[in-house]
Amino acid sequence: MSEEIIEAVYRYSSFQNVPLMLIASRNQIDWDGGYVNNWKTPSYISFLSLLKKQYQNADILICRDHCGPLFESSKIKDVYKTIDSDIENNFHLIHVDFSYYDVDYQKKLEESKKAIEYIHKCNSHTLIEVGTDRNTGENLKCVDEIREEFSYFNSISPIAFFVLQTGSLVKEINQRGSFNGKYLRSIRSGILDKDLRIKEHNADYLSKEQLRERNGLVNSMNIAPCLGILQTMTTIQRCNIHGVNFEDFLEESYRSKKMGQMA
């Protein structure tokens, strides 16, 4: 995530008349700062407001990704500070994600429910994305478990997107997963709910053929690493073309240790 990538999203949406989502994780943008320009949430929103003036036809949903306890923290109070700031700054969608919370499955459901209810108490118009699975590319839940989980969350609040493992898995700069269309078809036929909208994470580095496989099965996809790789490669190529030494840039990038953070 960078200023250039963010502007590219607005520009593409405006010129192609395509609705898109900007979905920042807590590592990237948060109420107390993040690794993207060290922006706090209000600073990020101010930047987006400027882009909206420049690209008036852009149709962008401002979203929060992985709103739950992160790898290094289990502090629930910090999650709610994020929620408060997001709602105050008019985020359209919040992804409630307690998959990394170090408790049992039932407790994850309960904490997810509390967060969803709190969000809608603060703003009933905020869209909800939710799921309890870590995206590992394997160990897919059975259809009955998925049905029960979706019904549980949908009884609390209408769910805009339900996060499911699809078999996709990003490793370094490659898509190493194997899309399981049969699994998703069985889920759709098993749940029989026209409001089920599936969100796929780790959807980077997919070919046109792989994207076509998802038609009618996946409603929305998240990408991130491939955009960072694209910007880095473009920067290096431009440096080579114009004879600019980029060794210091690469060293600074390596020392930042940011490549392993949740996108």
Label every model-predicted segment.
Residues 1, 20-24, 60-66, 92-96, ...:
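Hydrophobic faces of well-ordered beta-strands that scaffold small-molecule active sites
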Residues 1-64, 71, 229, 233-263:
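Alpha/beta catalytic barrel-like cores
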Residues 2-4, 27, 68-69, 101-102, ...:
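Gly/Ser/Thr-rich loops at beta-strand to alpha-helix junctions
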Residues 5-6, 74-85, 145-149, 207-211:
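Short, acidic/polar
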Residues 14, 56, 87-88, 192, ...:
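Anion (oxyanion) recognition and catalysis
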Residues 28, 86, 100, 168, ...:
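Short loop/turn segments at secondary-structure transitions that flank enzyme active sites
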Residues 31-124, 132-135, 139:
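Active-site beta->alpha loop and helix N-cap motifs at the rims of alpha/beta catalytic domains
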Residues 107-123, 133-263:
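Active-site capping/gating regions of soluble enzymes
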